């Protein structure tokens, strides 16, 4: 299993931002298509103080989505490549020999989102289910009002549109 270029770009950009956040610039540029296959989105991380520049260009929406989520507060998960897995397994073997206990290691590495580094606080996960429960009583109350005397106008609209076809 080899490391993908997008994973290299994400890890290098996050490390660069962790080292020197005030001098690091992120730029996203979009090249509109002259033909359908010529669409390009390029992501660039640049630090002139350390003279580092990372660039990733793609035309796939999946890659763009992954990079934008890496910029967000939750970050992304990256599977390590062959070299990193070998290094991790050597470390595990040394630990097992020393402690004579089996240690289960994760093969997936979580990368912190760049927005978390900018804010410098932990980001809490929000539950979308909590938002749905708050809106349900309002919808039920509106339905009760419509079933009572306020529904005369809505019945006229329904009867008026009864014979028409929907498009």
UniProtKB/Swiss-Prot annotation:
Modification sites for N-acetylserine: 2
Domain of life, source organism: Eukaryota
GO biological process terms on file: SRP-dependent cotranslational protein targeting to membrane; SRP-dependent cotranslational protein targeting to membrane, signal sequence recognition
GO annotation, cellular component aspect: nucleus; signal recognition particle, endoplasmic reticulum targeting
Basic and acidic residues compositional bias, start-end: 123-139
Compartment list: Cytoplasm; Nucleus
Keyword Nucleus: yes
Keyword line: Acetylation, Cytoplasm, Nucleus, Ribonucleoprotein, RNA-binding, Signal recognition particle
GO molecular function ontology, one term from the record: RNA binding
Spans annotated as Disordered: 123-167
Residues passing through the membrane, by range: none
A Pfam family: SRP9-21
Basic residues composition bias: residue spans: 154-167
Known role: Signal-recognition-particle (SRP) assembly has a crucial role in targeting secretory proteins to the rough endoplasmic reticulum (ER) membrane. SRP is required for the cotranslational protein translocation for ER import and preferentially recognizes strongly hydrophobic signal sequences. It is involved in targeting the nascent chain-ribosome (RNC) complex to the ER and is proposed to participate in the arrest of nascent chain elongation during membrane targeting.
Extra remark: Present with 3400 molecules/cell in log phase SD medium.
Subunit annotation: Fungal signal recognition particle (SRP) complex consists of a 7S RNA molecule (scR1) and at least six protein subunits: SRP72, SRP68, SRP54, SEC65, SRP21 and SRP14. At least SRP14, SRP21, SRP68 and SRP72 are proposed to get assembled together with scR1 RNA as a pre-SRP complex in the nucleolus which is exported to the cytoplasm.
Protein name from the UniProt record: Signal recognition particle subunit SRP21
Gene this chain is encoded by: SRP21
């Amino acid at each position: 299993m080899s490391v993908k270029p997008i994973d290299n770009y994400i890890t290098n950009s996050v490390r660069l931002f962790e080292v020197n956040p005030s001098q690091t610039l992120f730029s996203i540029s979009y090249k509109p298509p002259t033909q359908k296959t010529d669409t390009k989105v390029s992501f660039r991380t640049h630090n002139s103080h350390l003279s580092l520049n990372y660039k990733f260009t793609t035309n796939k929406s999946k890659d763009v989505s992954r990079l934008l989520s890496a910029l967000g507060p939750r970050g992304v998960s990256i599977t390590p490549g062959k070299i990193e897995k070998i290094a991790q397994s050597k470390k595990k073997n040394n630990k097992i020999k020393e402690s004579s206990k089996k240690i289960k290691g994760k093969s997936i590495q979580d990368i912190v989102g760049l927005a978390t580094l900018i804010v410098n606080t932990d980001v809490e996960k929000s539950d979308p289910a909590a938002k749905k429960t708050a809106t349900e009583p309002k919808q039920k109350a509106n339905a009760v009002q419509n079933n009572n005397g306020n529904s005369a106008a809505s019945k006229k609209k329904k009867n008026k549109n009864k014979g028409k076809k929907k498009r």
